[in-house]
């Protein structure tokens, strides 16, 4: 059930939360861990309970990895379409978890799937958000060659979100992969241009440029840290903030 706020003023009115498909695997090697879904539903419910409007984009890497098949000769467009279907499956699972927690949610797909999801319509999405429903955007942008990170940034801009929150397995952006390099240092704050110049690999080039060109702040944080999401929305300094540099 959506929990009521504890009296703190939320810093953001509307957010776009980007989850990787791999995040839904939990400790499994493939598929969806129901415990992870339930935990994410609880955390999203806390945000709804304090009046924050939540849009969600989920990747599909836990169900389908197109890179290996593409390398083996599969047509890239076909692989990308299969990846879009994987994101729809994840979106349906997340909607189910939210509804079981008594949180109203709707899936809007960029590709038409009559009887399964609603088709994406910006004006309808805005109305659902204003009605305190969680809107889960599925099937990426609906076009091949675009990542779900790009889709998340695009949807955030379209719905006039205050920030993109990218949930990862590490607590921010580092100079190198902290799992491989024990000397990697964490950044608390970066500009879009610094991310591009340093080739930090936070998101793909298209996604970062979209955020930069439309002045959309981006925060990268560790989704496995209890309370991190709520802390960010209350103005806490979790992870790494990426935004426009000073002119």
Swiss-Prot record:
Annotated S-S bridges? none
Record family assignment: Belongs to the UMP kinase family.
The record's subcellular locations are: Cytoplasm
What's the gene? Answer: pyrH
Q: Does the keyword Cytoplasm apply?
A: yes
The residues forming the signal peptide are none
Describe activation and inhibition of this protein.
Inhibited by UTP.
Cite the SUPFAM superfamilies for this sequence. Answer: Carbamate kinase-like
What pathway is this protein a component of?
A: Pyrimidine metabolism; CTP biosynthesis via de novo pathway; UDP from UMP (UMPK route): step 1/1
Q: What does this protein do?
A: Catalyzes the reversible phosphorylation of UMP to UDP.
Instruction: For this UniProt record, give its keywords in alphabetical order, as a comma-separated list.
Output: ATP-binding, Cytoplasm, Kinase, Nucleotide-binding, Pyrimidine biosynthesis, Transferase
What Gene3D superfamilies does this protein's entry cite?
A: Acetylglutamate kinase-like
Q: What is this protein called?
A: Uridylate kinase
> What's the catalysed reaction?
UMP + ATP = UDP + ADP
GO terms in the biological process aspect are: 'de novo' CTP biosynthetic process; UDP biosynthetic process
What species is given as this protein's source?
Answer: Pseudomonas fluorescens (strain ATCC BAA-477 / NRRL B-23932 / Pf-5)
Top-rank taxon of the source lineage equals Bacteria
């Amino acid at each position: 059930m959506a929990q009521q706020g504890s009296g703190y003023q939320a810093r953001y009115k509307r957010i776009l939360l980007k989850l990787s498909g791999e995040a839904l695997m939990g400790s499994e090697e493939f598929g969806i861990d129901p415990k992870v879904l339930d935990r994410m539903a609880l955390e999203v419910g806390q945000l709804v309970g304090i009046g924050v409007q939540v849009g969600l984009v989920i990747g599909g890497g836990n169900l389908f990895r197109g890179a290996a098949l593409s390398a083996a000769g599969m047509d890239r467009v076909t692989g990308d379409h299969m990846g879009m279907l994987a994101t729809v499956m994840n979106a349906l699972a997340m909607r189910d978890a939210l509804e079981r927690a008594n949180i109203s949610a709707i899936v809007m797909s960029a590709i038409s799937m009559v009887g399964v999801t609603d088709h994406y319509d910006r004006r309808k999405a805005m109305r659902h958000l204003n009605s305190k429903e969680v809107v889960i955007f599925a099937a990426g942008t609906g076009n091949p060659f675009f990542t779900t990170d790009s889709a998340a940034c695009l949807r955030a801009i379209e719905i006039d979100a205050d920030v993109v929150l990218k949930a990862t397995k590490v607590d921010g952006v580092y100079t190198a992969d902290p799992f491989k390099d024990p000397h990697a240092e964490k950044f608390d704050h970066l500009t879009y241009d610094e991310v591009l110049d340093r080739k930090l690999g936070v998101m793909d080039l298209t996604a970062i440029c979209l955020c930069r060109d439309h002045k959309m702040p981006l925060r990268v944080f560790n989704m496995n840290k209890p309370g991190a999401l709520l802390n960010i929305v209350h103005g806490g300094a979790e992870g790494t903030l990426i935004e426009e540099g000073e002119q």
